[in-house]
């Protein structure tokens, strides 16, 4: 059975995220471990972490995935921003360890005009610094590097960029990949049909290695292929379309992975409706 979920809120308490995921029939889910829009945060209380672990353990769903906050920029050439980004990454690894969450997803950031090579180097240095500063329990957490749509100065839109960063880090075994389908499509990887998907997975294998793919952010794309626009839309209703989304969900290399949707909630569909759409498309076509 394909594992399908969405990003859910932690409003009220982090343990309530499990209830919210169960209420809309998630098999897996993603959260922010704290307010994602600021640098400051409250420490995660041991009691709250224990409540989350207990709720998750009895729910029968998982894996749970934590996403890094919005502000960190691991590729930044600005020392203060880079240092704060390393601190944020170190803290999130610790929080994942407390929550017993196996995966932490991070964007790689922007090089601010310094060039892709410089950006890759800063990301590698940031990851190594966070790993060296983190507590021993954090070594159980796998850091997943997420591909980008290829917006200006971004790092990680090409699979080979992610592969180079991973291989250059001091402990690559602690690093995997989360592939966002909208971002990949916007970056120029075709996912609309079987031929396009096969070529995209070949590029992933060549650039990174398919064995390092652990989570898929399943999002349809509002903008066309190669647009470099990060615009998510409802599953099957965008430019990737039903055929493309179904092909991703049923591909034998991908079908066993957790699929997490980061789609809008609006008058067209809410999260529950997108999950139902994904389940329908996850049935292999005759």
Curated annotation (Swiss-Prot):
Cofactor: Zn(2+)
Recorded name of the encoding gene: nfo
Chain residues that bind Zn(2+) 2: 146, 180, 217, 262
Binding site for Zn(2+) 3: 183, 230, 232
Reaction catalysed by this enzyme: Endonucleolytic cleavage to 5'-phosphooligonucleotide end-products
Similarity field: Belongs to the AP endonuclease 2 family.
UniProt name for this protein: Probable endonuclease 4
BP-aspect Gene Ontology terms: base-excision repair
């Amino acid at each position: 059975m394909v594992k399908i979920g969405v990003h859910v809120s932690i409003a009220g308490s982090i343990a309530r995220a499990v209830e919210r995921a169960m209420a809309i029939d998630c098999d897996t889910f993603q959260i922010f471990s704290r307010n994602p829009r600021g640098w400051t945060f409250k420490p995660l209380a041991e009691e709250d972490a224990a409540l989350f672990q207990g709720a998750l353990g009895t729910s029968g769903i998982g894996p749970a995935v934590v996403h890094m906050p919005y502000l960190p920029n691991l590729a930044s050439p600005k020392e203060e921003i880079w240092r704060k980004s390393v601190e944020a990454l170190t803290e999130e690894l610790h929080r994942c360890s407390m929550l017993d969450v196996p995966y932490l997803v991070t964007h790689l950031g922007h090089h601010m005009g310094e060039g892709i090579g410089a950006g890759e180097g800063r990301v590698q240095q940031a990851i190594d610094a966070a790993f060296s500063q983190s507590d021993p329990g954090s070594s159980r957490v796998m850091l997943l590097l997420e591909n980008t749509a290829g917006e200006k100065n971004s790092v990680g839109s090409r699979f080979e960029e992610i592969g180079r960063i991973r291989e250059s880090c001091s402990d690559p075994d602690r690093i995997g990949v989360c592939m966002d389908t909208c971002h990949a499509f916007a970056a120029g990887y075709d996912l609309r049909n079987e031929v396009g998907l096969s070529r995209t997975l070949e590029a992933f294998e060549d650039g990174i290695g398919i064995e390092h793919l652990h989570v898929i952010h399943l999002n349809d794309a509002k903008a066309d292929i190669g647009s470099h626009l990060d615009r998510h839309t409802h599953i099957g209703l965008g430019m990737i379309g039903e055929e493309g989304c179904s092909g991703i969900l049923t591909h034998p290399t991908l079908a066993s992975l957790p699929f997490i949707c980061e789609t809008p909630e609006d008058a067209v569909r809410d999260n529950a409706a997108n999950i139902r759409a994904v389940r329908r498309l996850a049935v292999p076509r005759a």
